[in-house]
Amino acid sequence: MPSQYDLVRREYLKQLSDYTGRNTILYYSAWLQKSLMANGTFDFGINDNDKTGFMTCIYQLDKTKGLDLILHTPGGDISATESLVVYLQSIFGKDIRVIIPQMAMSAGTMISCSAKEIIMGKHSNLGPIDPQYGMYRAHGIIEEFENIKHEHEVNPLGTQVWGPILSKYTPTLVGECQKVIDWSNGLVKQWLMNNMFNGIPDAETKADSVVENIGSHALTKSHSRHLHIDYLRNLGLNITALEDDAELQDKVLSIHHSTMITISSTKAAKIIENQNGVSFINTIG
């Protein structure tokens, strides 16, 4: 028996789908509300388990209507993200829009760059795509090794203080970090060229510029950096302002607020749901 929270949220989802004439799936994570409650026991990020949720929600949809993906996520696993994008594009082709009511960080930004169009508000943000390798930021590890190398060339005796730090790292770590950076950047470049920038004469140059700006830890300074609409538009991304259509804005934000109330007031920790009320909900607590 669906709760009142479910009924309200699903009604707003249906209203948005009816308004756009498109399939609509929301993907919401409760990482902002429940990460401390989970205490490391729940994966709030994009992972391979999400594929089952999307399969459940896509089944029996009219695939000719395209897809609007409403995304709210801290990011997640690169391999799961790649597989999800490949799956969605195999079903809906290039007719995918990503709507960002609030935040789509890291791997969520990668998914956004695979779409033909991003819809976001003045309050919305994407984030840097610089990846992690295990527990560590890949760019940070490479920068640290480069600093050690430089200091050793200038003052070989001075680098002894780095011994305890170096002892934590495996011999192949730097190479593995570079590979995961190349993987992340390569995916975003490929997706941009194949969809959002498809048919544009300077597509590769534009894609390289986007990747350089959102993929460089040296430029973004922090993996948690919030990248807003004006900055992202200046990079050349195809972004429509949510405020350009007052009715669309009202419907999207109604979905957002009702979903945030759901994950704040119930045990739901991740919700994947379509406009027909078909859902895949993970809970904790």
What is the meaning of each model-derived region?
Residues 1-103, 109-285:
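Terminal-region recognition feature
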